[in-house]
Amino acid sequence: METPGQKRATRSTHTPLSPTRITRLQEKEDLQGLNDRLAVYIDKVRSLELENARLRLRITESEDVISREVTGIKSAYETELADARKTLDSVAKERARLQLELSKIREEHKELKARNAKKESDLLTAQARLKDLEALLNSKDAALTTALGEKRNLENEIRELKAHIAKLEASLADTKKQLQDEMLRRVDTENRNQTLKEELEFQKSIYNEEMRETKRRHETRLVEVDNGRQREFESKLADALHELRAQHEGQIGLYKEELGKTYNAKLENAKQSAERNSSLVGEAQEEIQQSRIRIDSLSAQLSQLQKQLAAREAKLRDLEDAYARERDSSRRLLADKDREMAEMRARMQQQLDEYQELLDIKLALDMEINAYRKLLEGEEERLRLSPSPNTQKRSARTIASHSGAHISSSASKRRRLEEGESRSSSFTQHARTTGKVSVEEVDPEGKYVRLRNKSNEDQSLGNWQIKRQIGDETPIVYKFPPRLTLKAGQTVTIWASGAGATNSPPSDLVWKAQSSWGTGDSIRTALLTSSNEEVAMRKLVRTVVINDEDDEDNDDMEHHHHHHHHHHDGQNSSGDPGEYNLRSRTIVCTSCGRPAEKSVLASQGSGLVTGSSGSSSSSVTLTRTYRSTGGTSGGSGLGESPVTRNFIVGNGQRAQVAPQNCSIM
């Protein structure tokens, strides 16, 4: 007939178990085996007591001695067992209290993260508003600069108009002077005309006088001439006089006509010049009036722009003051957040110390159980009791604790999850950029890789390469086309052919030769130039969290195993600010009473090693791993940091060997 422990062992062989559950089941099986052996031992003791009772009638003295010894051992054992039970109860209560406090701390951490996210969003909103106001200020500055330029242009036009007005006024003065000269010449011409008329009248009078004188002379001659020739002579004289008169009248008419034409032409020219000068003066006056009106409007606009500029400057000063106040407030909030994070880390360190105390208590109980096992083995050998087959198998098995085991993603997916065990994973990213182009985004499923030009200049990507390294696998390399250029501030996405994207250069490129960029726990994507110089890098590391609960014995204890492989070039993980180191313990050898050296204890290996049945003590080495999963980002939580604890378990007997023969010294 199988015991309950053997049934549970048989059932557990058909279900894949996690290492932590296996360890707990093994510990439970050990305790069950010890209880079975204790029951056998108690039965044997009872049979011996019955035999001793029958023998007590014959040997009273021996019975008294044996009864006293058995009574003392039994009372001591019951006392120690009661103390152990009380210790276990107190440990369970303390553990429940610690779990409640841990859940409360987690809630507080979530609230702090939410408050921090809200404050960061408010800060981003304020920064965006500041950028908008700066853009508005820049536009107003540009408008002011444009207005000032227009003002300078208008002032130049005003100066040019003033110079033109001065020229027109000078031309008007010249025209007036010419008009006065023309009027003077007209008066002079009229005077000359009057003089010529008077001369003509004088010449007429002289001519008439000469005619009369000539007539008298002819009359005198006619008297002397013959009567026959008198009539002919008079006719000839009349013709000559008539011809002379006609010639004089023609000359006088021509002279009058020429003088009138000259006078009329000069007078017409003077009138046209005066009219032209008058029109120019009117136009100049109109232009001067329009220029004055325009100058007044521009002066009003300039004063208005100056008022707007003063208002903008005042508003800018107010915005700068508000931004300074907001920045100081944000700094205070960040300082409060850092202080709260420091307090939280201190509380977590305190909780970790208390948890370490609980671990120490648990290890002490394990040592007592081991001593109890040794005591039972010694009693079984002394009483020649045969241990059960399960006990022999468990005594031949070595329980080794694992530290920092690297569990691959594919193996974790293939492993079936047990009841009460949940698992979650997330990616941690690390990026580095030394050039103009950065690795903006990497798809964890291997669909695409996105690059961004962070500078204000275009960058040629001809013959550049993207190198993808997944764990220890062979890297894959994508080479850009020779003439590809990435514009300033733009992005380019290189899609795998299996993603279903369309080729649309220069923003979207499809790698037809590769169906996927690949996936894994550690993904490193690097951008190389044509000379194989690395200018940008982004690394993704998967973080796996396993939560395991044991519902069979109503134990709510959680074990978190974090597989967090995060590689930095030239950086040691021991400098992680989120790492918590447990306190060291000094182990004393039960044989010689001296403290053990760490190097000797470490050389004995990691795990729980059971000695032979005849040894007086055994060595226990237990490795626990704690490390902050927050990394350098300031997050909280427990992660990997191997801490080894060594204990020496004795059976309560005094050592019979010399210190120089100690196995651990």
UniProtKB/Swiss-Prot annotation:
Ranges for domain IF rod come to 27-383
State if Ribonucleoprotein is listed as a keyword.
no
N-acetylmethionine PTM positions: 1
- Region Coil 2: what ranges? 239-383
Q: Which Pfam families match?
A: Filament, LTD
Where is this chain lipid-modified, annotation S-farnesyl cysteine?
662
Q: Which family does it belong to?
A: Belongs to the intermediate filament family.
What's the subunit arrangement here? Homodimer. Lamin dimers then assemble into dimeric head-to-tail polymers. Ultimately, two head-to-tail polymers assemble laterally into a protofilament with a uniformly shaped rod of 3.5 nm in diameter.
Q: What is this protein called?
A: Lamin-A
Biological source species: Xenopus laevis
